[in-house]
Amino acid sequence: MKPLAPFALIFGIFPLAALSQECAPGWMRIEGERAAAVAPGALIADMARRDVVLLGEHHDEADHHRWQLHTLAALHAQRSRMVIGFEAFPRRVQPVLDKWVAGSLTSAQFLAEVEWDEVWNLPAELYLPLFEFARLHRIPMVALNVERSLTETIAAKGWDAVPPAAREGISRP
């Protein structure tokens, strides 16, 4: 029997919850440009069969992060082999995420080592339940972002001004 491939949950890229300032009263499935109401159980079951699920939010909305945590828990109950990607972290902090999931850091150490206040600058309390869930269940966390200096250089000077070695593995947009 072929083992299930782990699937990834990527937070903060696609704004499903961010369609409004408040969480939607019902669950919505968005495919392409179409959105349709769907029963939560059916949507979770469908998401659990996918290789990648994108859960977005307004970064400063606590309700959106609670929704992410509840969705994550429901998905984990159906498919425990998963990976969670976070746009909050630049790739260079991946070793810190690995130490966190392994249980080698306190919350304070983790936030200091990922330079939370400098890099993300949002209340950590909004995100810590997600990080703690990953740690509790030993779900790998993946740093998805690039350094702010790279995005600033691209915005100011254009893609071609960035030497290939400084592109952090990113291809032409």
Language model: regions and residue ranges:
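Bacterial N-terminal signal peptides
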Residues: 6-17
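A substrate-binding/cap region within the structured catalytic cores of diverse enzymes
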Residues: 95-173
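Solvent-exposed loop/turn segments at secondary-structure junctions
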Residues: 58-61, 89-93, 147-151
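N- or domain-start disorder-to-order transition segments that initiate the globular core
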Residues: 19-50
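Histidine-anchored nucleotide/phosphate-binding helix
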Residues: 66-77
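Short hydrophobic beta-strand that contains or immediately precedes a catalytic carboxylate
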Residues: 53-56
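Positively charged n-region of N-terminal signal peptides that target proteins for export
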Residues: 1-5
